Amino acid sequence: QGKKGLDVLHFSPEWSLQTRLRNDTGLGKYVTADLSAPEADIHLDITSMTLPDGSFDIVLCSHVLEHIPADRQAMKEIARVLRPGGVAYIQVPLNDALAETDEDPSVTDPHERERRFGQFDHVRMYGPDIEDRLRNTGFKVTAVRPASVVGEGEMARYGLWDDVIWRCQR
């Protein structure tokens, strides 16, 4: 018997990445999840997942948490569904100029949300303290800049942004 591939849970999957991962025969199980998108494999509330503990080796969560009022609960749930040693790759809008994350649940006006949080449906703009939030969930956290992995040429070629990706190991 060959070694089983890694099981991946992908929240609000980007079409191009989803297509590539679905065709990756080296993966074990690849599952897409979203609260309401009809094309998702499963419909999940990221703050209260109906999945067993330790179900996945990898969780991909790019530009999701800024939409979730209870982001810390979502982080706990991500940690819960990861197997020991599993890794979540989390990306959020980040403003390094902020002393701390800007969030205010009383802000419901779409124009004010766009002004403060960068988009009408965001509930916060993360500051550098996102790293502490992730660590306080129990993750071992490493900040990764894509340019440090693929280089500036590849970044330009594929039109990638150099936004921090948080590598969060359980």
Q: Which residues does each predicted region cover?
A:
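S-adenosyl-L-methionine-dependent methyltransferase catalytic module, highlighting the catalytic core
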Residues: 69-78, 83, 87-170
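An acidic- and aromatic-residue-enriched active-site/binding cleft used to recognize and process polar
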Residues: 35, 61, 93-95
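Class I SAM-dependent methyltransferase SAM/SAH-binding core
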Residues: 3-48
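A short acidic, Gly/Pro-enriched loop at the edge of an enzyme's catalytic core
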Residues: 46-59
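Activation segment
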Residues: 39, 50-53, 68-69
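A short SAM/SAH-binding and catalytic strip from SAM-dependent methyltransferases
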Residues: 57-69
